[in-house]
Amino acid sequence: MYAVVNPATGEKLEEYPEISDDELDAAIARAWEAREALTALSAAERAEKIKRLGELHLERRETLAAIAVKEMGKPMEQALGEVDFCGDIYSYYADRAEEFLKDEPIELLAGEGTAVIRRSAMGPLLGIMPWNFPYYQVARFAGPNLIVGNPILLKPAPQCPESAEAIQKMYDDVGLPEGAYQTILATHEQIARYVKSQAGS
């Protein structure tokens, strides 16, 4: 169950519906479709959107922090610090995208020719987030992977659906391709079945 519960009183403030199996399948399909659109953008274009995401965290810091206070009882000063740190994380990866993604020559042990390490998109990635840092954990996972070109399926902690909703809104607002970042309010059982179905693929 995804719900905002006052950690001091135990009062349930708002409940969020879990997705169905069909909705989960559709989200996964959208993520695979988004891979093509995401990798069609240049690294600089992807980085520009992630840079803007960091700016949105700073512009909305008070609202985002207040959500964390409500959901998990984090002191406001700490919540603001977490949101600000996310702005730094997104900016860090965006500003260094070209450097991080450039081919890295490696020395051949034998023979002739050249060899490089090339970092390229693998496909959709699933992030299962804990409750204690609802913004930071997403930033460090999603930011760099989206710059590479990997779409993100993000399962938030059951205690943090409102912060997940606010994060989704920011990702939508920066104009990433549809399906590139999706919040999925899935059950543990749904995720376990999906992960098991992908074993060895």
Language model: regions and residue ranges:
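Rossmann-like NAD(P) dinucleotide-binding subdomain of oxidoreductase/dehydrogenase enzymes
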Residues: P105-S201
